[in-house]
Regions:
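N-terminal periplasmic/intermembrane-space "pro-region" immediately following the signal or transit peptide
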Residues: 2-108, 114-124, 343-346, 351
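Outer-membrane beta-barrel "beta-signal"
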Residues: 33, 467-480
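Residue-level signature of outer-membrane beta-barrel architecture
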Residues: 77-78, 91, 119-125, 173-176, ...
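Residues that define the transmembrane beta-barrel architecture of outer-membrane proteins
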Residues: 81, 107-113, 163-168, 208-212, ...
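Repeated loop/turn-to-beta-strand initiation elements of outer-membrane beta-barrel proteins
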Residues: 85, 125-129, 179-184, 222-227, ...
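Transmembrane beta-strands of outer-membrane beta-barrel pores
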Residues: 91-97, 133-139, 188-192, 230-234, ...
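Surface-exposed loop and membrane-interface regions of Gram-negative outer-membrane beta-barrel proteins
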Residues: 93-113, 121-171, 176-180, 184, ...
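Extracellular/periplasmic loop regions
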Residues: 144-157, 311-410, 460
């Protein structure tokens, strides 16, 4: 009943926000240059619903009707009738085995099915609306896995897919192409910026992360894109489900955050992007995730000849505490990646550093670079050992290779080696492999495996060094 109540409250709050701010929003993100070595496996994150094409006035509106009658009895019903339904169903099995990790004495086995169903109206004078709900059900006994700490299975390692039913999108949008292209959106929505390293919908999990926000995007001149959003609530993947402790760091965030992103794509060899993410976040665990991050990157690809394509990325950012965060620190981030695509093979290497800074505020010691609103699964290993970044920072050296087998079956291999950024700690290494196959227009099948081997220093999520974590996933997904 609590989930239903939470869903009802979100409908009321979101609906009010939509009425008060009907003229603003965030448009669907254009596809960015992705990091080939760390990008999320294809077709695993459900796509945002496509927007239906505009339609004419409903035939039932009489030709001589007054404008109000045409609007209410013709154009509004027409926009509803010519809208688009979307359906996504993902059946997934996840198994987690953590050796030498206290207090886990058993494995987790999580067979779940996620059903997402929504509807988007056709455009009406530039306006559109969307409603979408999600249900996550467990196929079998719920006590076979630790549902993110919400079901009392503390002897099993956590799997971030608790069962729930909730509203996950409810927004009103506006788009105009007159003079200066402009789009806006208000309400509960997906927001994916760039490669989702800082802001994303965490689409790997069965319940995606959404944002209660109002924002806009404008293109004042060709190839220059300006984006701003104000976020007042973050609906995280755990959904504040029953049983989740009140002080859990996994609960939804109350927010007073500003997202700013500026991109320029006139260069044929890539895109230049600058950003500022001012995150004022709090939940039952406190305000320690509040941070201000400023940075930018250049990423793109260039042909060497008609058979070889080189891709590259260079990014730098710095971060300080923000708003009510009691910590006082400053930390840097940088990422360099170089790859080559020689069909049907792609190879590459990268170096990502999430720095660390001395803390002169509450808690003392050091504070690591934070990414609390990121889509975390694609980065620093699929075993998700470093979802919580170490206080001493993290250096991730990775290599990847992908080969596309006959029948368009990509197989990806990634190797990670981890070190502390401050000090001489060795966090271990990880091997990842993934194979996927699309069947027709609507179906995708995926199998993924991650094997983490700890060394002399324990990662933040671990209770001891030399922990071995193995995770396995098998999924079938239908998108319509």
């Amino acid at each position: 009943m609590s989930n239903i109540s939470n869903c009802h409250n979100k409908i009321v709050l979101t609906g009010g926000a939509m009425v008060l701010a009907v003229t603003a929003s965030v448009f669907a993100q254009e596809k960015p240059f992705m990091q080939a070595g760390t990008s999320q496996p294809p077709s695993l994150s459900p796509p945002q619903a496509t927007e239906p094409a505009a339609t004419g006035t409903n035939a039932v509106a009489a030709a001589d009707a007054n404008p109000l009658e045409k609007f209410l009895n013709g154009e509004v019903p027409d926009a509803i009738a010519h809208g688009k339904f979307n359906l996504n169903v993902r059946l997934r099995y996840e198994q987690v085995d953590e050796d030498n990790q206290t207090p886990y004495t058993k494995n987790s086995y999580a067979p779940t099915v996620r059903t997402r169903f929504g509807y988007t109206t056709a455009p009406l004078y530039g306006f559109q609306g969307m409603l979408e709900g999600v249900n996550i059900s467990v196929l079998g006994p719920e006590h076979n896995y630790n549902a993110a700490g919400s079901n009392g299975q503390g002897a099993r390692p956590p799997v971030g897919d608790p069962p729930m039913t909730r509203l996950d999108q409810a927004w009103l949008g506006y788009t105009s192409t007159n003079y200066v292209p402009f789009s806006a959106k208000v309400g509960q929505q997906q927001i994916n910026l760039d490669n989702q390293r800082f802001i994303g919908d965490a689409g790997w999990r069965q319940n995606m992360q959404t944002f209660d926000a109002i924002g806009a995007r404008v293109t004042p001149v060709k190839d220059l894109n300006l984006y701003y959003s104000y976020v007042w609530d973050v609906n995280r993947v755990y959904g504040d489900v029953d049983g989740l402790p009140a002080a859990s760091p996994n609960r939804d965030f109350d927010s007073r955050s500003h997202l700013i992103n500026v991109s320029y794509a006139a260069c044929p060899y890539g895109r230049l992007v600058g950003y500022a993410y001012l995150l004022d976040l709090s939940n039952g665990a406190g305000n320690a995730n509040s941070c201000a991050t400023y940075g930018g990157y250049f990423a793109g690809a260039a042909p060497v000849n008609d058979k070889v394509m080189v891709d590259y990325r260079a990014e730098f950012a710095w971060q300080d505490q923000y708003a009510d965060n009691p910590q006082r620190y400053s930390a840097d981030y940088y990422n360099f990646e170089l790859g080559a695509n020689i069909k049907p093979i792609a190879i590459g290497t990268g170096y990502e550093v999430l720095g660390s800074g001395a803390n002169s505020g509450a808690g003392g010691e050091r504070v690591g670079f934070k990414t609390p609103l990121a889509s975390l699964h694609p980065f620093n290993g699929w075993a998700e050992v470093f979802i919580t970044h170490p206080n001493n920072g993290l250096q991730d050296i990775y290599e990847y290779a992908q080969v596309t087998l006959p029948e368009q079956i990509p197989v990806r291999f990634i190797y990670h080696k981890y070190y502390a950024d401050s000090g001489s700690g060795n966090y271990g290494q990880e091997f990842d492999v993934m194979i996927s196959k699309k069947f027709g227009k609507y179906w995708n099948v995926m199998v993924e495996f991650a094997d983490y081997l700890g060394e002399n220093v324990a990662a933040p999520a671990l209770t001891a060094p030399k922990v071995n974590i193995q995770k396995f996933w098998a999924a079938v997904e239908f998108n319509f």
